[in-house]
Amino acid sequence: MKQRLEGRGHVVTVFDPIDLGLPLLEKPHFAYSSSQVPQKLQEINQALSTSDAYVTITPEYNHAPSPALVNLLNHFGSSTFSFKPSAIVSYSAGQWGGTRAAIALRPILSELGCLPVSAMIHIPKAQDVVDEDGTLRKSEDESEWDSYFERTFSQLEWWGEAAKRHHDVVDPFKASPAFRSSPSQRNAP
């Protein structure tokens, strides 16, 4: 996915929840006072906050998204993700391509404020379709997959560009200010 998006002219930053090594969530980024936020969380929050759009990639575990991905998302509040589009890519070893995980991820992303585009990418029998590095196997018809990915990427680009342009006209955080009168409200967009 990274190479495909870069090929479309995008700068892509990968946040692999396993590589980041965040602990099981006990205290999210927004629950710390600004001077107490762990540096790692602050760096991730800064990178996520400055992104124009998000592509989440998840395997399906027990009909649900990756616990590591959900843990990563839950470390940050909606003010990190708000007013930007997202796309969902899912995969599984079975015939459904992680569809159930993708559907479960949709309301999580919506609550974070990075509304998912309607088109999703599902990769069934991923072990037969892609190599461990994420490239399509030689036995796969690359043009067929590119055609499938196009709808999702086009929607994400359209919404990303529209949100960015409108943000230049109207600051969404002023139009819809965050509730910040108490610590319990810090997460609200």
Language-model features: locations:
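Generic secondary-structure signature for well-ordered alpha-helical cores
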Residues: 3-10, 110, 114, 128, ...
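Mobile beta-alpha loop/short-helix "lid" or hinge segments that flank ligand
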Residues: 13-24, 78, 114-135
